[in-house]
UniProtKB/Swiss-Prot annotation:
It comes from Methanocaldococcus jannaschii (strain ATCC 43067 / DSM 2661 / JAL-1 / JCM 10045 / NBRC 100440) (Methanococcus jannaschii). It comes from the Archaea. Homooctamer; dimer of tetramers. This is Fructose-1,6-bisphosphate aldolase/phosphatase. Beta-D-fructose 1,6-bisphosphate binds at H24, Y95, G108, N109, K137, Q246, S247, R270, D291, Y352. Mg(2+) 3 binds at K236, D237, D238.
């Protein structure tokens, strides 16, 4: 009998930035080794299998187990791993040591404590391929565009037209990360309403995608916003995602296809700029130019009786060389704008950066415009009916 005994398996991807080697460029091997030592001790006690990787200065813990989502033991294990890595980071005087650990001690769940988390639970299919995405220098809304392409755009995913098990479409769970609420939208019927929301990178993020015909989980994203948790800028959220592929879900090639055409995402230097999301292999996930451009890696696994077979470093494929060239061209063009919009994020997305502190120094130096007065709606009105020069 298989070790799973027909039980559901849970895939948990939990990430944190606990220190970078030379700025924000890389989580060094010493930190990964510290995490691996903690996870190895928990095999067969808490988890079934694990893989530790990095994207830029973020450590990503990929774990399989049978304890379900939001399990205290699994989350506590990840927290301990990050704590041990933080100890090493402080010994090495790494930049930003422990920066994503926003609480002094673990309290049952990493959500709201700094680390990002994406988890899904399912019964293994006859063959269970999954793709784990890890990003650096961007935030959860970076997945809005590619997830829409994967699960709602037939020009990207031919299976939406040709696969009878997908033709009924997918359901999107969208989170208002500012208002702390969510909504479910069905595609293709509610596609336009979905786009009205997820095109807003400031407020709305896709959290999960479900197959409509049986409500089976298809994808999940970490949507934790560090700035709203900490109350100040402590780094970009650097999201992770899990996507199931094949046999009733988009094929692996359809899951990867959206990244063949790089799109602009918020983040990059100081979390304050728009820039391209560049797909790279694990070895190239070391953003240096202006702390970027933002990177994304894609690791393919086969889940076999709860074990993680792999990974296959999917974006290392030569087929994405042109995408990388495009991303660098996009970076060249938008970098010319320097501190000006549209390279610089709008003021509403800079609220938790250091910009407001800079502007505070000018507050007392502003004076009213002569002959004009502001009205509450943000427009202007004349003080009297006469002409004002």
């Amino acid at each position: 009998m298989s070790r799973m005994e027909n039980n559901k398996v849970t895939i948990s991807v939990i990430k944190a930035d606990v220190g970078g080697l030379c700025g924000h460029t890389l989580a060094p091997d010493e930190l990964l080794e510290a995490c691996e030592a903690v996870l190895e001790e928990a095999v067969d006690e808490i988890i079934l299998d694990y893989y530790v990787t990095r994207c830029g200065d973020d450590i990503d813990l990929i774990m399989s187990h049978k304890l379900g989502c939001d399990n205290e033991k699994v989350h506590g294990l990840a927290w301990r791993a990050f704590e041990e890595a933080t100890k090493v980071a402080k010994e090495l005087k790494l930049y930003g040591a422990g920066q994503d650990l926003l609480a002094d001690s673990f309290s049952g769940n990493v959500r709201g404590m700094g680390p990002g988390c994406a988890e899904m639970e399912f019964v293994e299919r006859k063959s269970e391929p999954i793709v784990v995405f890890c990003c650096d220098k961007t935030d959860p809304t970076a997945f809005n565009y590619p997830l829409f392409k994967m699960f709602a755009d037939p020009f990207n995913t031919a299976g939406l037209v040709f696969d009878p098990s997908m033709i009924s479409g997918f359901k999107f769970e969208v989170h208002d990360v500012v208002g702390h609420k969510k909504v479910f939208l069905d595609t293709p019927e509610e596609m336009y309403m979905l786009l009205a929301l997820i095109g807003d990178y400031e407020k709305y993020a896709i959290k999960r995608v479900y197959r409509r015909r049986d409500n089976e989980i298809a994808a999940v994203v970490s949507t934790e916003k560090l700035n709203y948790i900490a109350g100040e800028y402590v780094g970009k959220d650097d999201p992770v995602a899990i996507v199931r592929a094949q046999s009733g879900f988009p094929a692996v090639g359809e899951v990867l296809e959206p990244f063949a055409n790089p799109h602009f995402v918020p983040g990059w230097m100081r979390g304050s700029h728009w820039g391209p999301l560049m797909p790279v292999g694990e070895e190239d996930a070391t953003p240096t130019r202006f702390d970027g451009p933002a990177r994304i890696i894609a690791l393919g696994f086969q889940v076999c009786d709860g074990m993680l077979i792999g990974p296959n470093d999917l974006f290392a494929d030569k087929g994405f060389d042109k995408a990388r060239e495009k991303a660098l061209e996009m970076a060249d063009i938008i970098r010319r704008m320097g501190p000006f919009q549209p390279h610089r994020l709008p003021a509403t997305m800079m609220e938790y950066t250091t910009v407001p502190k800079v502007l505070e120094a000018l507050e007392d130096r502003f004076i009213p415009l002569e002959g004009l007065e502001l009205i509450e709606e943000g427009g202007i009105t004349r003080k009297d009916r006469g002409d004002v020069e």
